[in-house]
Each structure stands twice: as structure tokens, then as C-alpha cells.
């Protein structure tokens, strides 16, 4: 990804491969109507990998980065950007690129919310965690997801070497109406408890074994496991039989594979309700 894509420091410079940039630009061209007067902004342009492609969409482009690695990029912290110089009621602004992710995607969310304050569309390379409803629910409700595509393995380079960061390219569009926010499910027939409270099973939350269920929880870490107590009155063995075949999309994240509480709730609710006698 760009020099500012995953981390904002001189030691971790990720660059998006040209072919990946081309695919992203093609999707923007296919799904977004860009008029001659519209403005395109790349908020974290890094080494300028998106410059050529964006200029192919429109001559009106602005490229910013807090630490530019290309002479065509203006030095600016996008989170402090003001669009007063572009205040034109007939001009729509389209924000395109690869924002910094930050810890648990905190910076990516900030970049999205900043862009959402003035943009008509937001087209970003994002961590795969943005395929999860819990992350999508953090995006302003007036924006609707109109397209997304998983990026292939090794879409980026660091110091000239292929680098695999699980990412997705998403296009969000501003509309007059708010999108439906997926409600947070509540556990049915079970509850999450702390390890010191009586519980029946542990569920591995993170790592290559994410999703694995175990009744032997003595040595299970509170940092990497959920602890669950069944409340439906059924035998523990019957409940385990109901949930043991659950499959999670554990690759929808950057870094170690992980399963969120909402994912566990949805999966357990469905499995336990399906097997009610």
C-alpha cells in the first residue's frame, strides 16, 4: 500500500502494486460518475501510486500526505484538511486511495469520517475487517456501500518485497437517505462471562485456531479467548454438538485471524435455535 497505508512512519512503508491500483481505478470508473468539474482527492498519497490513475479519471486532482514521497504531493495532514477552497455547489468531491489503518483500524475510521464530512464518494483500500458489520456500522449512515472487492494475496510491497496484508477495496456513496444499520444481536441461550465466573466453554478469539471450542479452560488466556456460560437449560454436550460445526470467516481482518463478539453471537444464536427440540 502507500507509504502511509498501514503505518505512518519511515520504517514501515507499504506500497500498492501498480496492477492493484489499476484494478481499483477501474472499479471507480465503473461505479462512479465523475463529471468534468468534480474534484478527486487522494488523502494519503504516499509515493504517488494513485496519481496516474486518478488523473486518467479527471484533470482536477489534489494529492496530500503528511510525509510525501513524491514531488507532486502536497504536504498536509488530511485530518486537518478544510475544503473551503473547493466550495462550489456544483462540484462533487471524490476521495480515493489508501488511508493509514492505525491500531484496530482507528486511523482508517478517522479518515473515512473526515472524508464523509464533504465527499460525495469514498473509495478506499481498507483492512478486511471492514467486511464485518461491526466495522461498517462505524461509517456515517448517509453513505452506502455500492461495491467491494477482496484484494489478492501479495497486493503490496515493502522494501521491494511482496507483502500480504488482507485488504478489501470498498466504494461508499453519499445518498439522501440513511442506510439500514445492522442491529447488534444479543446472546440467546448463552452469555459471555469473565473467566473467574462459572462457565462451560472457551472459544478461541484470535490466532490460527480462532473459533476452536474447549471445555478445558484452566490454561486459557483471557486475552485470546471468550468464556461462555450456557443458559438454555440443555446439557453442555448437546449445546457443544449444536455449535461445533460453526465456520467463521476468520480472514476478514488484518494481522492475526480474529472473531468478534457479534460474529459469535450470530453464529451461536442460529446454531442453538436451529437445534431446539
Language model segments and positions:
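Class I S-adenosyl-L-methionine-dependent methyltransferase catalytic core
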Residues: 1-277
Amino acid at each position: 500500500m502507500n507509504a502511509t497505508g498501514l503505518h505512518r512512519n519511515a520504517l514501515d512503508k507499504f506500497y500498492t502494486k501498480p496492477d492493484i491500483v489499476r484494478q481499483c481505478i477501474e472499479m471507480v470508473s465503473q461505479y462512479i460518475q465523475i463529471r468534468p468539474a468534480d474534484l478527486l482527492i487522494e488523502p494519503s498519497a504516499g509515493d504517488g501510486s494513485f496519481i496516474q490513475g486518478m488523473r486518467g479519471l479527471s484533470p482536477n486532482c489534489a494529492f496530500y500526505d503528511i510525509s510525501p514521497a513524491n514531488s507532486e504531493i502536497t504536504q498536509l495532514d488530511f485530518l486537518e484538511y478544510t475544503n473551503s477552497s473547493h466550495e462550489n455547489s456544483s462540484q462533487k468531491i471524490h476521495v480515493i486511495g489508501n488511508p493509514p489503518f492505525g491500531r484496530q483500524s482507528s486511523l482508517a475510521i478517522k479518515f473515512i469520517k473526515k472524508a464523509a464530512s464533504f465527499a460525495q464518494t469514498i473509495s478506499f483500500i481498507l483492512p478486511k475487517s471492514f467486511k464485518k458489520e461491526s466495522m461498517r456500522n462505524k461509517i456515517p449512515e448517509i453513505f452506502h456501500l455500492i461495491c467491494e472487492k477482496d484484494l489478492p494475496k501479495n497486493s503490496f510491497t515493502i522494501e521491494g518485497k511482496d507483502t500480504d496484508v488482507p485488504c478489501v477495496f470498498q466504494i461508499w456513496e453519499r445518498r439522501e437517505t440513511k442506510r439500514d444499520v445492522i442491529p447488534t444481536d444479543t446472546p440467546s441461550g448463552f452469555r459471555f462471562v469473565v473467566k473467574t465466573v462459572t462457565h462451560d466453554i472457551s472459544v478461541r478469539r484470535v490466532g490460527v485456531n480462532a473459533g476452536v471450542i474447549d471445555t478445558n479452560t484452566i490454561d486459557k488466556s483471557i486475552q485470546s479467548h471468550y468464556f461462555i456460560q450456557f443458559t438454555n437449560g440443555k446439557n453442555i454436550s448437546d449445546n457443544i454438538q449444536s455449535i461445533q460445526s460453526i465456520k467463521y470467516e476468520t480472514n476478514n481482518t488484518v494481522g492475526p485471524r480474529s472473531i468478534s463478539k457479534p460474529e459469535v453471537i450470530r453464529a451461536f444464536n442460529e446454531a442453538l435455535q436451529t437445534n431446539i427440540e
